[in-house]
Amino acid sequence: MQDKSTLSVKTFDVGPMLNIVYLIWDNTTKDAAIVDPAWDLTEVLNFTKQKGLKLRKILLTHSHHDHVNSIDILLKENDLPIYINKFEANFWKKKYDNLIMTDSNDSFSLGKSSISTIHTPGHTPGSCCYSFDENLIAGDTLFVFGCGRCDLHGGNPEEMYNSLKNLKNNLDQ
């Protein structure tokens, strides 16, 4: 992998709750990853095609339905690995042959660049964030004006507090 990242990211607001689907791609290789594929992905897939991107990975921040409900649609057309935190995989209990279980501080390549995982339990036991360059894809761990709910199945306010504190203390300003 090279030192200088060539990654770009685009957000798409989808579904009745305006969830965010992220598309990350390497500008050199055109390899792409989709984060939290949910709801209608028409706009995302059209953008991918328009830019000549090659979808290579599915990344999940957590397993709630509103973040994963289009995985099967993607897998009908593509044989893609699904990256998920190991604790979330156990919590979700959904079986896919192509799950790649990650741990905190793991990293993997996308094209010629690297993406790191950060385990951020609280919203769910295996919630995670993805970090690259100066970007943080936080799923439902962190919002502009708050954090994800901790009162749903698997949520834990104390773990959320510790996760947010960890993000604050360990990410570059």
Model-inferred region functions:
Residues I24, D36, H62, L74, ...:
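Divalent metal-coordination and catalytic microenvironments
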